[in-house]
Amino acid sequence: MAAQRLGKRVLSKLQSPSRARGPGGSPSGLQKRHARVTVKYDRRELQRRLDVEKWIDGRLEELYRGREADMPDEVNIDELLELDSEEERCRKIRGLLEACLNPTEDFVQELLAKLRGLHKQPGFPQPSPSDDPSLSPRQDPAHTAPP
């Protein structure tokens, strides 16, 4: 009998509304937090980027049909957008497609047109490996060989 009461008490505490609430005291705190994160970015821009990425993947599959091993691993949209001119973008894209035996000029021109409507993805600046002191040789006198 006492065990039943104890079991009911534990069960009722586990099912209490205060336990069901997420962070911030709201019942669906996790969902609301995700909603705030996605609202932070422009959904249209993200959708455009996704559409361009899907288009790139589809076209690369067409261009490299039967020679998938030669297909570039990635066409980095942000890397292309960081380049200063359309000529540089064109050279970069053509360089990625050097191994393609099919004509690529239509793909290059269409991709350049699609890139004109996109903006670089906002994010945290990526430090250069040369900026990281942990990657440079140690300058500790105890570990430096005498001249």
Swiss-Prot record:
Which GO terms of type biological process are on file?
A: cellular response to xenobiotic stimulus
Mind telling me which InterPro entries this protein's record contains? CPI-17, CPI-17_sf
SUPFAM superfamilies assigned to the protein according to its UniProt record, in alphabetical order: Myosin phosphatase inhibitor 17kDa protein, CPI-17 (SSF81790)
Query: What are the Phosphothreonine sites (modified residues) in this protein?
Result: T38
Organism for this UniProt entry: Rattus norvegicus (Rat)
For this UniProt record, give its keywords in alphabetical order, as a comma-separated list: Cytoplasm, Phosphoprotein, Protein phosphatase inhibitor
Query: Where is region (Inhibitory) located?
Result: 35-120
Q: Which domain of life is it from?
A: Eukaryota
Composition bias of kind Basic residues appears in: 1-11
| Annotated family | Belongs to the PP1 inhibitor family.
Query: Which function does this protein serve?
Result: Inhibitor of PPP1CA. Has over 1000-fold higher inhibitory activity when phosphorylated, creating a molecular switch for regulating the phosphorylation status of PPP1CA substrates and smooth muscle contraction.
Q: Where in the cell is it found?
A: Cytoplasm
Q: What is this protein called?
A: Protein phosphatase 1 regulatory subunit 14A
**PANTHER family, alphabetized:** PROTEIN PHOSPHATASE 1 INHIBITOR POTENTIATED BY PROTEIN KINASE C, PROTEIN PHOSPHATASE 1 REGULATORY SUBUNIT 14A
Q: Provide a GO CC annotation, any one.
A: cytoplasm
Q: Region annotation Disordered: residue ranges?
A: 1-37, 118-147
Q: Which residues carry this modification: Phosphoserine?
A: S26, S128, S134, S136
What GO annotations for molecular function exist for this entry?
A: protein phosphatase inhibitor activity; protein serine/threonine phosphatase inhibitor activity
Taken from the record, one Pfam family name reads PP1_inhibitor
